[in-house]
C-alpha cells in the first residue's frame, strides 16, 4: 500500500535529494518531522527495522542537503539506519515492499539505486569502502566528496580501526560521521563505548585546531544535552582522543537531532583537508516513546499500529531454536560454573537474555568483534573452561581464520552454537546462513552436527559440551522448532553416528538438519528409506555404506549450499568406498539467496516437501 503523500506536504516536495536541495534551509526541520512520521507509518504497515532509522532522520536530511549525492559518495554502515535514506532517494512509494519478496532490499544495495554506493548488511565495512572511494576520488580529481556513516556499535569492530589507521596515514579527504546513540542491537560493551559516553559527561578541555576554527565560524550555541553533559557546548571541542592519534581531525560531539547545526557543521567541514570525524549524539527510536524506552525491543518490528504504542502480542506456541539453546545453556550453567558463554553483540537474537541475567559472571558479550569472540573462547579453553560461542552462521564467516588457526589447529574444545543456519528470510543475501557447512567441513579436528528437531538440538549441544578432543559445531535454523518433545535428561550422542527413520526400497534419502519432516513426507510417497544423518563430520560411513549397497539411488537433503556441503561429503565417501551409485544433491543453489519470507524462499528453491518430491521425480525420469 502507498500513503497519501498530501498528509506530508513538505516531504512531498522532496522525493529526491535534488528536490531537497531546492528547498530553503528553514524548511528542513519540517522535512525532518514529516520524514519521521512517514517512516513511522510505513514500517508500522509493512514491518522492518525501526528504531535505528528514527534516530537518523535529521542526519539523513542534512547529508543529502549539503552533499551532492549521488555524485558525492555516501556509505552507510550495516544499513539498519538507512530507511530515511531510502525514502529520500526516490523510493518513498515502494517502502511498503521493504524486506518482502521482490520488494526493496532491507539494506542499501547497489543494484537498487545509484544513491546506494556500497551494498551492506554486516557491520564495520563503511570506513574501508569510503577510504577506497576517497583514494579513487583523489585520482579522478573531479571534486567528489566521500562520507561514511557508522554507529557506535559498529565502532567496536577491529576492521574499522584498521581502516582509520590507514586513512590517517594516507591523509585523503573523507568524512566519517560517528552516530553515537549508545546502542547497537544489543547493549554495547567495552572501553571504547565508555570513552564515547564520557566525552559528554566530563568537563571537556583542549585546544582548537585550525580546521575546527573554520567550523566554529557562524555556529549557533549547541543545545544543552540533558543528562549527558555538565556544560553548554558552543560549537565543538577537540579532545585528545584515539581518533586524533589515528590522524583524524575530530569535531564534536554535536546534537544529531538539530538539523540546522548539522547542516552548518557539514558545510564548513566540506572544505577541510584530510580525514575528518564528526561525532554526533542521537537517540535511537527518536520521536516514538516506546522505541526510545526500549530500542532493543523495537530494533526490528512486525506490522503494528503506531497509535497503539505497542507491538502486537505474540501468540504462545512453539519455542524457537534460539530459545532451545538458551534453555540448554541455563540448565548446564546451573550445574557447571566452568561453562563460559560468548556472544558477539547478539544476546537477544541468540536467546541468551535469561542466561546473561542469571549467570552474569559466566556471560561475555564481545561486542561486534567476531574474530575476538572466537579467540577469546580459545583462551578460555586453554585454561580448562568450557567455552560456548553463540554466533549466527553469517557472522561466523568473519571469524573463519580464528576458527582454523586459534581453535581447530590447537584441538581446543570450544562449542560453536551456530544460529540462523540456512534460510533466514527478510534480511536477504547478507544474512542467509548458506555456507557454514561448506566452509567448516574442510577444517580438520572439527565435529559438525545438524539437529532434525529441538530435542536433537538439546542433546547435540550437550554432546559438544562434553566432547574434549577438539571443537564442535551445532548448526540450527532461525525460527520455531518442530514440536518434538524435549527430553530433560541430556545424553551425549555417539560421535559420527546417524539413524534410520524409515525403511523403504530403491531410494535412500540422507537428511541433514531440520528438513527431516519434509524428507519423511516425500519418502511416504516414494516408499524410500530415510536416514537422519545427524553428523556432517565425521560422516556415518558405515550407515552410508549399508544404505548404498541396499538402494539404487541416493538423495541428500540439506539447507546449505550444494557446493562443498554435506551432500558433497557423501559423494566423496562413496568414491572412497568404490561404490558407484547415482546421487542427487538437494540444497541451496550456487547463487546469493535474496530476501523474502522464509516459506516463500524455501518454496521457490524447491526445498519444501513438494519441491523435494518434484526434484527426485525429475532426476529419476532423466
Swiss-Prot record:
Note on how the cofactor is bound: Binds 1 Mg(2+) ion per subunit. Binds 1 thiamine pyrophosphate per subunit.
SUPFAM superfamilies: Thiamin diphosphate-binding fold (THDP-binding), TK C-terminal domain-like
Residues involved in Mg(2+) binding: 152, 181
GO molecular function, one term: thiamine pyrophosphate binding
GO process annotations (BP): 1-deoxy-D-xylulose 5-phosphate biosynthetic process; isopentenyl diphosphate biosynthetic process, methylerythritol 4-phosphate pathway; terpenoid biosynthetic process; thiamine biosynthetic process
GO cellular component entries: cytosol
Keywords from the UniProt entry: Isoprene biosynthesis, Magnesium, Metal-binding, Thiamine biosynthesis, Thiamine pyrophosphate, Transferase
Cofactor dependence: Mg(2+); thiamine diphosphate
EC supergroup of this enzyme: transferase
UniProt keyword Methyltransferase, yes or no: no
Enzyme Commission code: 2.2.1.7
UniProt: thiamine diphosphate binding residues: 80, 121-123, 153-154, 181, 288, 370
Pathway annotation from the record: Metabolic intermediate biosynthesis; 1-deoxy-D-xylulose 5-phosphate biosynthesis; 1-deoxy-D-xylulose 5-phosphate from D-glyceraldehyde 3-phosphate and pyruvate: step 1/1
InterPro entries per record: Dxylulose-5-P_synthase, THDP-binding, Transketo_C/PFOR_II, Transketolase-like_Pyr-bd, Transketolase_BS, Transketolase_C, Transketolase_CS
Keyword Transferase: yes
Annotated catalysed reactions: D-glyceraldehyde 3-phosphate + pyruvate + H(+) = 1-deoxy-D-xylulose 5-phosphate + CO2
Assembly and oligomerization: Homodimer.
Family listed: Belongs to the transketolase family. DXPS subfamily.
PANTHER family: 1-D-DEOXYXYLULOSE 5-PHOSPHATE SYNTHASE-RELATED (PTHR43322), 1-DEOXY-D-XYLULOSE-5-PHOSPHATE SYNTHASE, CHLOROPLASTIC (PTHR43322:SF5)
NCBIfam families for the chain: dxs (TIGR00204), PRK05444.2-2 (NF003933)
Function: Catalyzes the acyloin condensation reaction between C atoms 2 and 3 of pyruvate and glyceraldehyde 3-phosphate to yield 1-deoxy-D-xylulose-5-phosphate (DXP).
Name of this protein: 1-deoxy-D-xylulose-5-phosphate synthase
Organism: Shewanella denitrificans (strain OS217 / ATCC BAA-1090 / DSM 15013)
Classification of source organism: Bacteria, Pseudomonadati, Pseudomonadota, Gammaproteobacteria, Alteromonadales
Amino acid at each position: 500500500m502507498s500513503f497519501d503523500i498530501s498528509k506530508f506536504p513538505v516531504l512531498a516536495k522532496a522525493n529526491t535529494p535534488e528536490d531537497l536541495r531546492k528547498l530553503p534551509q528553514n524548511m528542513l526541520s519540517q522535512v525532518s518531522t514529516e520524514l519521521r512520521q512517514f517512516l513511522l507509518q510505513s514500517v508500522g504497515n509493512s514491518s522492518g527495522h525501526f528504531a535505528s532509522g528514527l534516530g537518523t532522520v535529521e542526519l539523513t536530511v542534512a547529508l543529502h542537503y549539503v552533499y551532492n549525492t549521488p555524485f558525492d559518495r555516501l556509505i552507510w554502515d550495516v544499513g539498519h539506519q538507512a530507511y530515511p535514506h531510502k525514502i529520500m532517494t526516490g523510493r518513498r512509494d515502494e517502502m511498503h515492499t521493504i524486506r518482502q519478496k521482490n520488494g526493496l532490499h532491507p539494506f542499501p544495495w547497489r543494484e537498487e539505486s545509484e544513491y546506494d554506493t556500497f551494498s551492506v548488511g554486516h557491520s564495520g565495512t563503511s570506513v574501508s569502502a569510503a577510504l577506497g572511494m576517497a583514494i579513487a576520488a583523489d585520482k579522478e580529481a573531479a571534486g567528489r566528496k566521500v562520507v561514511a556513516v557508522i554507529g557506535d556499535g559498529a565502532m567496536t569492530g577491529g576492521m574499522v580501526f584498521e581502516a582509520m589507521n590507514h586513512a590517517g596515514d594516507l591523509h585523503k579527504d573523507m568524512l566519517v560521521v560517528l552516530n553515537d546513540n549508545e546502542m547497537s542491537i544489543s547493549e554495547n560493551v567495552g572501553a571504547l563505548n565508555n570513552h564515547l559516553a564520557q566525552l559528554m559527561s566530563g568537563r571537556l578541555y583542549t585546544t582548537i585546531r585550525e580546521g575546527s576554527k573554520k567550523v566554529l565560524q557562524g555556529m549557533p550555541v549547541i543545545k544543552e544535552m540533558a543528562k549527558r553533559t555538565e556544560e553548554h557546548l558552543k560549537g565543538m571541542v577537540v579532545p585528545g582522543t584515539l581518533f586524533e592519534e589515528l590522524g583524524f581531525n575530530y569535531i564534536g560531539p554535536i546534537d544529531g537531532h538539530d538539523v540546522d547545526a548539522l547542516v552548518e557543521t557539514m558545510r564548513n567541514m566540506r572544505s577541510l583537508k584530510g580525514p575528518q570525524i564528526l561525532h554526533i549524539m542521537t537517540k535511537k527510536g527518536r520521536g516514538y516513546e516506546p522505541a526510545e524506552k526500549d530500542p532493543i525491543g523495537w530494533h526490528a518490528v512486525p506490522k503494528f499500529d503506531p497509535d497503539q504504542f505497542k507491538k502486537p502480542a505474540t501468540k504462545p506456541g512453539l519455542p524457537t531454536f534460539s530459545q532451545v539453546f538458551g534453555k540448554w545453556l541455563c540448565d548446564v550453567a546451573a550445574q557447571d560454573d566452568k561453562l563460559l558463554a560468548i556472544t558477539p553483540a547478539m544476546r537477544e537474537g541468540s536467546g541468551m537474555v535469561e542466561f546473561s541475567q542469571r549467570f552474569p559472571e559466566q556471560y561475555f558479550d564481545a561486542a561486534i568483534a567476531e574474530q575476538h569472540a572466537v579467540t577469546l573462547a580459545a583462551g578460555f579453553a586453554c585454561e580448562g573452561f568450557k567455552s560456548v560461542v553463540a554466533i549466527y552462521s553469517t557472522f561466523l564467516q568473519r571469524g573463519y581464520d580464528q576458527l582454523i588457526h586459534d581453535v581447530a589447529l590447537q584441538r581446543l574444545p570450544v562449542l560453536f552454537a551456530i544460529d540462523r543456519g540456512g534460510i533466514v528470510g527478510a534480511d536477504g543475501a547478507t544474512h542467509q546462513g548458506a555456507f557454514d557447512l561448506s566452509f567448516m567441513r574442510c577444517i580438520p579436528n572439527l565435529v559438525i552436527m545438524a539437529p532434525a528437531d529441538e530435542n536433537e538440538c538439546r542433546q547435540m549441544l550437550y554432546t559438544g559440551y562434553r566432547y574434549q578432543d577438539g571443537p564442535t559445531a551445532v548448526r540450527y535454523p532461525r525460527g520455531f522448532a518442530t514440536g518434538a518433545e524435549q527430553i530433560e535428561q541430556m545424553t551425549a550422542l555417539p560421535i559420527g553416528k546417524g539413524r534410520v527413520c524409515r525403511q523403504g526400497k530403491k531410494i535412500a534419502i540422507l537428511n541433514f538438519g531440520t528438513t527431516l519432516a519434509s524428507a519423511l513426507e516425500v519418502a511416504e510417497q516414494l516408499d524410500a528409506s530415510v536416514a537422519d544423518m545427524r553428523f556432517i563430520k565425521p560422516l556415518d560411513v558405515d550407515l552410508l555404506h549399508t544404505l548404498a549397497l541396499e538402494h539404487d539411488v541416493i538423495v541428500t537433503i540439506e539447507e546449505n549450499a550444494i557446493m562443498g556441503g554435506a551432500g558433497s561429503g557423501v559423494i566423496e565417501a562413496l568414491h572412497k568406498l568404490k561404490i558407484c551409485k547415482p546421487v542427487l544433491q538437494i540444497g541451496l543453489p550456487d547463487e546469493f539467496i535474496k530476501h523474502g519470507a522464509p516459506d516463500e524462499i524455501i518454496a521457490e528453491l524447491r526445498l519444501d516437501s513438494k519441491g523435494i518430491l518434484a526434484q527426485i521425480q525429475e532426476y529419476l525420469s532423466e
